Regions:
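A general structural signal for short secondary-structure junctions and capping/turn motifs
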Residues: 1-4, 56, 99-102
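N-terminal extension/subdomain marker
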Residues: 1-16
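Amphipathic, charge-rich alpha-helical segments that serve as recognition/docking helices
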Residues: 16-37, 99-175
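Short alpha-helix boundary/capping and kink motifs at helix termini
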Residues: 5, 17-71
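A short, basic-hydrophobic beta/loop patch
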Residues: 59-128
Length: 176
């Protein structure tokens, strides 16, 4: 079941298992923000997102939130929530992010159970180009519990794909 709830930004917790850049499960929001700002993987691109968002927060794409006990974890929409937390000073940043849009302190969120959230995330990101082939396989195996693909096995055993990003393509996976 899904429902829309208005939640306070200060209560929202960033998802450590985000396929964009998974981090230690005990990491804090600040740890995730610091990593996103470093953006060594070039997957977060927060300044670009801030520019694309325009002058205000667009409510047409709601963050997907799953409650773990009383903790609302942001499963989808972490980049937008990071920008919101920066905008309101809920995390510390050592650099200026230009073009931060206006974001209210309370926002509507799609609150659902983990299974629905994961299905929605896979539908939204799995084949849209926002994830690499390796990201998708990692998500399917580590988050959704599917068997490890041969492509992911090859990466885990050799590191070949991450060392050669030109191999991180669907057609390469299909050939393997």
């Amino acid at each position: 079941m899904q429902r829309v709830e208005i939640l306070r930004l200060e209560d929202l917790v960033l998802w450590t298992e985000n396929p964009r850049d998974p981090i230690d499960k005990d990491a804090s929001d600040q740890d995730i923000v610091d990593r996103a700002l470093l953006d060594k993987s070039a997957k977060w691109t927060l300044p670009k997102l801030a520019r694309e968002m325009g002058e205000y927060y667009d409510f047409s794409e709601l963050p997907t939130v799953v409650f773990h006990g009383d903790k609302p974890i942001v499963y989808d929409g972490n980049r937008r929530i990071i920008l919101a937390k920066i905008y309101h000073g809920l995390v510390d940043v050592d650099r200026n992010i230009p073009y931060l849009p206006f974001i209210p302190q309370e926002i509507p969120c799609n609150v659902c159970d983990r299974e629905i959230a994961l299905k929605n995330i896979l539908r939204k990101h799995g084949n849209s180009g926002s994830w690499t082939t390796l990201d998708r396989d990692w998500f399917l195996h580590n988050i959704m519990g599917e068997d490890m693909s041969t492509f992911l096995m090859l990466e885990e055993k050799t590191g070949l794909i991450s060392a050669n990003p030109c191999l991180n393509k669907r057609f390469v996976k299909e050939e393997i």
